Amino acid sequence: MSFAFDLISDLHVETWDQFDWHHQATSPVCIVAGDIARDRDIVTRTLKHLGQCYQAVFYIDGNDEHYSHLEDLGSSYSDLVRRIKRIPNVVYLQDNVVIVNGVAILGTNGWFGFDFDLGIDASQVDQWCQENYYMSATATKNIARLSNTDASYMIDSVQKLQRHTDVRKIVMVTHTVPDPALIAHDIDLDGSMKFNVMGNRLMMQAMAADTENKIHTWCFGHYHGSVDQTRSGIRFVNNCRGRQHTKYSRHVYHPQRIVIDF
């Protein structure tokens, strides 16, 4: 038996001249791993468009969707839920596990706890974010809190899915990078403050909860370089488009088709 899906993320639609996904689909369903745009109306329009291109679109938000709402992330999430539930063929993965043909799709943003590299002081990274990204102390506190709750949600959900006999495999979806080792090769990031806002190291605790070895693939975004690695039998893969006119961006961009055989 097999299950196939297209993976896309970090479209940053507002930085490109246009986004037209007609005739681009290579699978019946699509996973979008966050950072569609900062403008909520663009996010909504893009998801509507993708919903016309696929039988189903499974979406998780990125940090960019909350760019103007970091002071009140609770309200920000409520607004996303309200908008997305009206869109045909689009499913918001936050707090919503989807099971398709024996495959569970489990997703959350993930955020970052400012401690991705334990050798870099998290409090200094927190302050650096406030100064460089013009975040308030309230915003960074909210982000750090959600990084913990998102990790707990994924760990607890993986544990529960071990007992579901109808779930053969699990696809994990986070916007941020789940393991520092996946991007440790990047000399532009290594040892930098920015490295510590790339991912959530707590996510790897979900591996210990996977006692039946159901986790098959872990999809993520946020890091605009290319990653496709297998670690401990699990495929870690991203497919980010990136912002136009930046070092890591793709003018020619296609979905990454992923097939799970079991």
Model-derived features: positions:
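Active-site neighborhood of phospho(di)ester-bond hydrolases with catalytic His/Asp-centered motifs
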Residues: 7-9, 30-35, 58-63, 91-95, ...
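A basic- and aromatic-enriched beta-loop-alpha substructure that forms the phosphate/nucleotide-
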Residues: 56-129
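Active-site-proximal loop/helix segment associated with metal-binding centers of metalloenzymes
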Residues: 106-171, 176-194
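Binuclear metal-dependent phosphoesterase catalytic core
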Residues: 2, 99, 190, 195-215, ...
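Short, conserved loop/helix-junction motifs that constitute active-site signature segments
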Residues: 23-26, 49-54, 164, 207-213, ...
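Active-site environment of divalent metal-dependent phosphoester hydrolases
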Residues: 12-17, 37-42, 64-71, 97-99, ...
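Beta-strand-turn-beta hairpins that frame and shape the catalytic cleft
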Residues: 1-6, 97-107, 168-169, 230-235
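N-terminal active-site segment of His-dependent metallophosphoesterases
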Residues: 1-60, 64-76
